Amino acid sequence: MNELLNNAAFQTYATCSAILAIKMLLTGTYTSVQRMRTKSFVNSEDAKAFQGNFGEQEHPVVAHALRIQRNDLENIPLFFVIGLIYVLDGASASASAAYCWTFTIARLLHWIVYLNHLQPWRAICYFVGYLSILGMAVQIILS
């Protein structure tokens, strides 16, 4: 275990994973803030508890926040799995740093541009992150 913790590739992976986990927590918080700000709830008990409006449809601002959150849930856990396998498979420190930091920065930028409705930047950031995971997956298969 000590050997793994002292491995530079693992340290990079762990740092990036922690940053992405915090980012996911902040995205969930952002969704909650938007729900509270608009006082719109799809659960009647929440509407009652927070003196808000109950409805079957999400408020557009909340729906946008939920799409950002869902996008994270579709992409970041894949990084957690593939990145860990890649590091455990013996990735070099430099290759691990390149893939992990590229993915992490792409996801942080994706978050910013998604919050601000900026296309084509959102698609570009998504694609950069996608290629990072794909690159690690291919390296795992080839090793």
Where would I find each of the regions flagged by the language model?
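Juxtamembrane boundary at the C-terminal end of a transmembrane helix
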Residues: M136-S143
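Juxtamembrane "helix exit" motif at the C-terminal ends of alpha-helical transmembrane segments
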Residues: I82-A93, I141
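Cytosolic, membrane-interface loops and tails of multi-pass inner-membrane proteins
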Residues: T29-R67
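Structural signature of hydrophobic alpha-helical transmembrane segments
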Residues: A93-T102
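Core segments of transmembrane alpha-helices
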Residues: R70-I85
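Interfacial loop-to-transmembrane junctions
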Residues: A106-L131
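Long, highly hydrophobic alpha-helical transmembrane signal-anchor segments
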Residues: M1-Y30
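Transmembrane alpha-helical segments that form the membrane-embedded catalytic/substrate-channel core
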Residues: I22-T38, L108-W111
